[in-house]
């Protein structure tokens, strides 16, 4: 099975799938500013019920993505990563059109779940690039790739809000579908992969996949680290606007300030991710991961002690710059410990744990805030990251299998 494209076509693939990740990130985030309004339009009027059903509609996509990811990862190792990119982009485009026609909350939930099942563009993009990029440039390549979805997620809510104001809620779903279809077309014509399909009987079992890992204990730790990164990122989401209101008092532009402070980590990530990736290629991604996990703890604790919102914004910018190094470092370390034949499944397992973190992070933050106050969320999150730091440090000290 030959996975390496000729010459430097991996660079072309990197730039094309970066654009695909950008379109996917933008497409997903286009609808986020008005999802509660769409739930309300579907008949959920009570305030408490609206909060509940909006949360369910948001989380169900990640839940079903986590369930489906291992299946698609196994299929990508048999049929190729480009096919999975095409399947994901086209499938999500079709579902977005159907969401635009939803008539009640149950139809929306089913379609949001289907969106999670058919998703997976980003992990398959990671697997494609990971199996093609020279090892010495893997940190930079995966760091650069990570900025694609971040860029799309940053610009998506702004464009989505403008489109919803201009054209209404439902047309935005059709526009999102068009964006995802463009992603499908770009991938179809411009991504190259030299892949020899593997028959079902020759495909490795799950036990064989894990047995083939160079350092199974470390890879499992990296899966867990991915989940904790998303838990730490998402734990603040439910309380951020309310915490800013507590810090700022009665201000007229709360929504604008909250939006800016919510966005600054992504802006910092765009700047720092490729640079940390190059640093990881030079000194080792394990050192970068341990260093940034430790730094993030020292960013989280002061957030509980700030006295005004601009201090919170500055700390979130620094945290975003630090966090940008973590997932690419994890992915690079995973790449070091796998063979190309199992890349799809291993990256899909990692994505599944990432989705679990996306679901549990906001739930944890909301629970801690409800019982102990907003500031306790930052202390609790720092404690979780500290536990992960110790676990990672111990795992890195475990000898690699010969």
From Swiss-Prot:
It is a multi-pass membrane protein. The chain crosses the membrane at residues 14-34, 52-72, 90-110, 113-133, 149-169, 171-191, 219-239, 254-274, 288-308, 318-338, 376-396. GO terms for cellular component: plasma membrane. Keywords: Cell inner membrane, Cell membrane, Membrane, Transmembrane, Transmembrane helix, Transport. It is found in: Cell inner membrane. GO terms for molecular function: transmembrane transporter activity. Gene3D superfamilies: MFS general substrate transporter like domains. It comes from the Bacteria. HAMAP family: MFS_MdtG. PANTHER family: MULTIDRUG RESISTANCE PROTEIN MDTG. Belongs to the major facilitator superfamily. DHA1 family. MdtG (TC 2.A.1.2.20) subfamily. This is Multidrug resistance protein MdtG. It comes from Proteus mirabilis (strain HI4320). The gene is mdtG.
């Amino acid at each position: 099975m030959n996975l390496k494209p000729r010459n430097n076509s991996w660079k072309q693939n990197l730039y094309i799938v970066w654009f695909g990740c950008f379109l996917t990130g933008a497409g997903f985030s286009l609808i986020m500013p008005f999802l509660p309004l769409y739930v309300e339009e579907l008949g959920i009027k009570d305030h408490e019920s609206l909060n509940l059903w909006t949360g369910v509609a948001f989380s169900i996509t990640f839940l079903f993505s986590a369930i489906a990811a291992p299946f698609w990862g196994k299929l990508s190792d048999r049929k190729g990563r480009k096919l999975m990119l095409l399947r994901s982009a086209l499938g999500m485009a079709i579902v977005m059109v159907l969401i635009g026609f939803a008539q009640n909350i149950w139809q929306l939930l089913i379609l949001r779940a289907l969106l999670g099942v058919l998703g997976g563009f980003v992990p398959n993009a990671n697997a494609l690039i990971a199996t093609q990029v020279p090892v010495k440039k893997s940190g930079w390549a995966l760091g650069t790739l990570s900025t694609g979805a971040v860029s799309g997620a940053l610009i998506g809510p702004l464009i989505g809000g403008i489109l919803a104001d201009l054209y209404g809620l439902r047309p935005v779903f059709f526009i999102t579908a068009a964006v995802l279809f463009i992603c499908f077309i770009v991938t179809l014509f411009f991504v190259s992969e030299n892949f020899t399909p593997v028959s079902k009987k020759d495909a490795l079992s799950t036990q064989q996949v894990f047995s083939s890992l160079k350092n199974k204990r470390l890879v499992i730790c990296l899966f867990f680290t991915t989940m904790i990164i998303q838990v730490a990122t998402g734990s603040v989401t439910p309380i951020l606007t309310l915490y800013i209101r507590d810090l700022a008092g009665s201000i007229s532009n709360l929504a604008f300030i909250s939006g800016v402070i919510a966005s600054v980590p992504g802006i910092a990530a765009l700047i720092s991710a490729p640079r940390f990736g190059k640093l990881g290629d030079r000194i080792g991604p394990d050192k970068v991961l341990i260093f940034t996990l430790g730094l993030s703890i020292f960013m989280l604790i002061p957030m509980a002690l700030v006295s005004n919102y601009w201090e919170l914004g500055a700390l979130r910018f620094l945290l975003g710059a630090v966090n940008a190094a973590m997932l690419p470092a994890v992915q690079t370390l995973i790449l070091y410990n796998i063979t190309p034949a199992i890349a799809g499944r291993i990256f899909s397992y990692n994505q599944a744990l990432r989705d679990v973190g996306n679901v549990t992070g906001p739930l944890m933050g909301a629970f801690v805030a409800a019982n102990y106050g907003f500031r306790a969320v930052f202390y609790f999150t720092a404690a979780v990251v500290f536990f992960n730091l110790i676990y990672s440090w111990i795992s890195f000290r475990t000898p690699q299998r010969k």
